[in-house]
Amino acid sequence: MVMANSNLFNSDYADMARALLDAGAEFMLVGGYAVSVHGYPRTTFDIDFWVRPSPENAQKVMGALRAFGAPLQEISEADFDHPDMVVQIGVAPRRIDLLTRIDGVEWEEAAPHAVTKDIDGLPVPVVGLGELIRNKRASGRPKDAADAAALEKIAEGRNA
């Protein structure tokens, strides 16, 4: 099911999401924007896209970055071919982070639970609520623990 959420992304974020979608890249929205989409709006100074680490997806992500107009001098396909990479484009409050791993959750277990949300007219895949809670709990940062607690209340309300 696609759920609408208008005017959430700035133009850079929307353009990057559109480029990933157009390239056919496998990705999910994670981080603070995913927290907001799942019902707990909060301030964040970047956007986090979790991309599947694989050779095939790496080619698609690089194509998306080229289409987006990202500076590619220090970025290669190999950066997206294995876990534990973070590629940052731009500076806060418009920074885009492309991650190949998130704490506490593996791609293969999260992908079937991703939900597609209509964000600014784009069908954006978002990490599932349960996986987002696990990710936030695993990170160990105080703000992520607060996010997890708020998301758990939202999950309880949905299950009531």
Feature map (PLM): residue ranges:
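Compositionally biased terminal segments of proteins
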Residues: M1-A160
